[in-house]
């Protein structure tokens, strides 16, 4: 199913001074149009072609692709790597960052790495429980997704270089 780009009364939303995101997802949202995103589960391999093959399925149907972060409590290619690969191919991307099983330094690294690779959209999540995964282990929850969201905003806006202290 394809969605038509129809403007909504009261849109487009103004762009704030100093803001320079030309992203497709942002353009759709600012127009007030219905935005469609989908999740892409990263492969268990290091082969970029596995990522591109999965993304091509959604060509012409979605406004952005969410790269999941350790979905199902399993190990996959990182969300940062998937976003970097897809951005090079021109896809609009949303980097998911899960706070499950990561300490603050790992979360900081993901957010800063994503920003360095051109990621403009982040979805902060608690993450799937480890009981869903394929390895026997105990889950670790260092931070809440809301706290991570608050802190990631400051990093992505360039107002803070160290987060979640």
Q: Where do the PLM segments sit?
A:
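N-terminal amphipathic alpha-helix/helix-capping segment at the start of soluble metabolic enzymes
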Residues: 2-38, 45, 49, 53
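Acidic (Asp/Glu)-rich catalytic clusters
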Residues: 26-31, 55-60, 80-90, 111-119
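Hydrophobic faces of well-ordered beta-strands that scaffold small-molecule active sites
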Residues: 36-40, 63-67, 93-97, 122-124, ...
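Glycine-rich, proline-tolerant flexible connector loops at the mouths of alpha/beta enzymes
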Residues: 42-46, 59, 63-80, 129-141
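Short, acidic/polar
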Residues: 45-58, 78-79, 104-111
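Alpha-helix-loop-beta-strand connector modules within alpha/beta enzyme cores
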Residues: 73-96, 141-165
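Structural motif corresponding to the early beta-alpha repeats
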Residues: 91-107
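Flexible, glycine-rich active-site loops centered on histidine and acidic residues
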Residues: 103-151
